[in-house]
């Protein structure tokens, strides 16, 4: 089964995205802060990581950099989903190792299409 780690501090957004992914047959592990997210990604060995940038404990930039420099997770694609859409934030995310960027608020159908591309569905 395809597995995604969703690192998002908004329970509402996480719930909506989790439900949409699960309808597609994708297992979702949700983490609500950066520390939990890093631990979940290492433990679960997901096919994809969906990552917010504005998180408690560790920022999404820090999480991405940690995951992309860890032998257990460096190959896992990281898709940023954030309201921080300015050029500097996008550049920082890319420098941290992010593979793709989806701006919030996002269109769920369009976002699911992009996510499916990374999952090769």
Residue map of PLM features:
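Conserved acidic carboxylate
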Residues: 8
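C-terminal output helix
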Residues: 18, 106-116
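Two-component/phosphorelay signaling modules centered on CheY-like receiver
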Residues: 11-29, 118
């Amino acid at each position: 089964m395809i597995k995604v780690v969703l690192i998002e501090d908004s329970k509402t957004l996480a719930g909506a995205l989790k439900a949409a992914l699960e309808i597609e047959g994708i297992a979702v592990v949700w983490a609500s802060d950066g520390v939990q997210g890093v631990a979940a990604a290492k433990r679960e060995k997901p096919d994809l990581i969906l990552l917010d940038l504005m998180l408690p404990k560790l920022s999404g930039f820090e999480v991405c950099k940690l995951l992309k420099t860890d032998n257990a997770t460096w190959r896992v694609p990281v898709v940023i989903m954030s309201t921080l859409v300015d050029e500097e934030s996008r550049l920082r995310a890319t420098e941290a190792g992010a593979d793709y960027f989806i701006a919030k608020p996002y269109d769920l159908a369009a976002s699911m299409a992009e996510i499916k591309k990374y999952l090769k569905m």
